[in-house]
UniProtKB/Swiss-Prot annotation:
The modification Phosphoserine is found at S177, S224, S227. Residues 99-115, 199-213 have a biased composition (Polar residues). The keyword Phosphoprotein applies. Participates in mitochondrial biogenesis and stress response. It comes from Saccharomyces cerevisiae (strain RM11-1a) (Baker's yeast). This is Mitochondrial biogenesis regulation protein 1. Residues 1-20, 93-156, 199-224, 258-325 are annotated as: Disordered. Keywords: Mitochondrion, Phosphoprotein, Stress response. It comes from the Eukaryota.
Length: 339
């Protein structure tokens, strides 16, 4: 009975303060429920400077539906004047302190609501904003990872291209070195034929000169046809059979000098007594046989100068290739070069 009388009486100032203090608490719960249902968990990156103004606008436009319970009716009666005050007063008067302190408490409650709504560490939202942050950071760092992954295949392509260029250069140098040796050998044969042209047989010398010229000019053209040019000497270790400089290192110089001194007087004795055309024929025959039997690395100039003394020939460069036995590879190369 006593409670019914109190409800019929008008509320005092202290009771009004209590009711005003209870009202915003229920308001906070409703707003939390509303924000939890509406707010996107992945929108933390949005601008939050004017969040308080948005919350105040939501407070003013939010309609509380009254229920049958007496507590909700009292809250409805107390919240209606608050909404009128918020709508009527400007923004500066909302922040100013009032006599009963209800507006200041409501403002403090709205600030606390803003802090709770936009708190990224709050457990009510399931930690989704932190996951969103991780995604954004991984998105920004993925550009650097993509750059690194793009640089690695570029480096691999560069290394492959450099390796191909080096291989092509080495193969081209090895292929070009052999025709140079051929051209040098043909120039030696040209000199020998020019020395031979002093003899009465001029037809043979001119024919051989034309043959050497045709060979020297046809070598670069038939580079892919000849089997000797296609041999990769740097792979099979055949440089010592092709270049005369490496051939001299493998031979014994003393044996070659002795053999040269033993063979030289016989040729002089066979050439001196006859000054007729027989000597020229024998010289031409010996020259042709020496040029065909000896490989390209041998020095054939020694057979075309019969009147030089033996000491000068010994002081000059000896024939280093004659002091050892010919190998099968050397004979095959010599036959291919001669033919």
């Amino acid at each position: 009975m006593r409670m019914e009388k109190t409800t019929d009486k008008p509320l005092s100032a202290g009771d009004m303060n209590d009711e005003y203090s209870r009202g915003p608490i229920d308001d906070i719960d409703c707003l939390n429920f509303f924000e939890r249902a509406v707010q996107d968990p992945c929108c933390e990156a949005c601008d939050t400077e004017d969040a308080d103004e948005e919350l105040r606008a939501k407070l003013s436009s939010f309609n509380f539906q009254p229920d049958s319970s007496p507590c909700n009716a009292k809250c409805q009666q107390t919240l209606n004047p608050l909404c009128k005050i918020d709508e009527g007063l400007p923004a500066e008067s909302e922040l100013a302190p009032s006599r009963n302190g209800s507006v200041s408490e409501a403002n403090s409650d709205t600030n606390s609501i803003a802090s709770t709504v936009h708190d990224p560490v709050d457990s009510k939202y399931g930690g989704m904003p932190s996951l969103r942050k991780a995604k954004t950071t991984s998105y920004f760092t993925s550009s650097s990872s993509n750059n690194t992954t793009m640089r690695n295949p570029l480096k691999k392509c560069n290394t492959n291209i450099n390796g191909l260029l080096v291989n092509r250069r080495s193969s081209s140098s090895s292929r070009q070195s052999i025709p140079e040796l051929f051209s040098g050998a043909c120039t030696k044969k040209k000199n020998n034929v020019l020395l031979k042209s002093e003899t009465p047989n001029s037809e043979f010398s001119t024919n051989s000169l034309q043959h050497c010229n045709s060979r020297s000019f046809s070598l670069p053209r038939s580079r892919s046809r000849s089997s000797a040019i296609a041999i990769p000497t740097h792979l099979y270790g055949l440089e010592k059979y092709v270049s005369p400089e490496l051939d001299t290192l493998t031979a014994d110089p003393e044996e070659s000098i002795e053999r040269f001194s033993n063979n030289r007087p016989r040729e002089i004795s066979s050439c001196c007594p006859n000054d007729t055309g027989d000597t020229s024929s024998s010289l031409s025959h010996s020259n042709t046989s020496s040029s065909l039997n000896f490989p390209l690395g041998t020095n054939t100039n020694q057979f075309h100068q019969p009147r030089q003394p033996v000491q000068q020939q010994q002081s000059s460069k000896p024939n280093f290739g004659a002091g050892r036995k010919k190998s099968f590879i050397e004979m095959s190369l010599a036959s291919s070069f001669a033919g």
